[in-house]
Design a protein with these regions (language model features):
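Phosphate-handling architecture centered on phosphoinositide signaling
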Residues: 1-227
Length: 227
């Protein structure tokens, strides 16, 4: 903070001492007020419309750091984001410092870079029970059936040094997922999501083709092979 000098990049280090290491460790560091502040804290106030800048470090079970990124953190999910342990999305962007997570996060996927990962709390149905039922279902069919499935790995999570429980790291189901898995032109994706309202939320593209398909299905018989 010396006068007439440019500030340097913030350096973040995580030290997990004398804690069980039977799971990989995910350490998230942020300015406390951006997560838990009474006025601007996205976690305390359950704000889903804004990201908080964070540093994220993943340590494998052998203690070696797998990756470190400066990224954005936002609340995700629907009803489950009201739980004490909230679902979170970590998304890289140049404005935070890193554009990708340069690491093969999931052993059963061929990808070595990710722009986002999803920290799932096992959802409304399973957060307070097994914590892995949804992930187990995806693991059973992944690379075995012609179905969309999200890779998963559990991690012991710390936020600002405080243990935050087990999260399931999942592939983020978004337009980047579709590009990576299917080679789709990112400018030719309509990605819609329903969240407790009759009209879809447009995350990418628009609703024209979707509603045209709905109209076709409602006005034409699917018993006719040509349809």
């Amino acid at each position: 903070f010396e006068g007439n000098k440019l500030p340097s990049k913030i350096v973040t280090k995580s030290y997990i001492i004398d804690e069980p290491n039977n799971l990989p460790i995910l350490s998230i560091t942020a300015f406390p007020e951006t997560l838990f502040g009474r006025e601007i804290g996205i976690y305390t106030n359950e704000i889903k419309s804004r990201e908080a800048p964070v540093n994220v470090q993943l340590f494998e079970k052998d203690g070696n750091m797998a990756f470190e990124v400066d990224a954005g953190l936002r609340l995700t999910g629907q009803a489950s984001f009201q739980y004490p342990q909230k679902p979170l999305t970590i998304e890289t962007a140049s404005k935070y410092g890193d554009e990708v997570i340069d690491y093969p996060v999931f052993s059963n996927r061929p990808f070595e870079q990710y722009t986002s990962i999803y920290l799932r709390n096992s959802g409304t149905q399973d957060n307070r029970h097994t914590m892995f039922r949804d992930a187990l279902q995806h693991t059973i069919v992944i690379n075995q059936m012609d179905l969309e499935a999200q890779a998963y790995r559990p991690v012991a999570t710390y936020i600002n040094g405080q243990y935050w429980g087990i999260y399931n790291i999942r592939e983020k189901l978004d337009d980047n997922y579709l590009v990576a898995h299917h080679g789709i032109d990112p400018d030719n994706i309509d990605y819609l999501e329903y969240e407790f309202q009759p009209e879809p939320i447009v995350l990418a593209g628009d609703t024209k083709a979707y509603f045209a398909l709905q109209n076709f299905l409602s006005q034409n018989s699917m018993n006719i092979e040509a349809n």
